[in-house]
Amino acid sequence: MKKLESTLVNMVGVLVAVALIMGGILAFVNHVTEGPIKQQAEKTLADGIKAVMMSDNLTVTANDTIKENIEGKECTFIVHKAVDAQGNELGAAVESTTLGFGGDLKVLVGFNPKGDVLGYTLLAHAETPGLGAKADTWFQKDGKASIIGKNPASPLTVSKDGGDVDAITASTITSRAFLKAVNQAYNVYVKKNNTDANSGATTQAGVKK
């Protein structure tokens, strides 16, 4: 009986030791990879801002997080305001997320000071690979239903809903979600501009991306 108890104690001791070692290894790996992952995410965003603002020579002057209640749900937007090398306002790149066919669809949309769409890129999505790839090109300048240059003051909608934007073939849900993200990004951008104007906010130089 004592031998059995001793064996059980040894087994428990070994399991605890293994668990502690594995926990330590996982913590170390997380610590080692956390920095590079964060740096890569920041680089991806910085490159995305340049792409959607159509400028390699810009300075991001503000990164404002804005929360809006949309259809009873709190949604988070991030507005990245930018200026050119001479300090002239370029507009802003806005991060916007909506629910697509497979899950969240996160879009980065660039607007000029008038609110016209300069460019866009998908930051993340849970659509099938084919739909995600199509959404990233379908609405581009050389795509089949370009939104570049359009102003969402009149909300962008697909043809099936009475709009003038052709939906991705066999993917109306993803198209609606994408355009909704763009429309919401525009509304937040305009609201932010109005708030800044009313408060007398001025642009200050930031860190060049």
What role is predicted for each listed range?
Residues 2-209:
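Flexible, solvent-exposed loop/hinge segments and secondary-structure transition points
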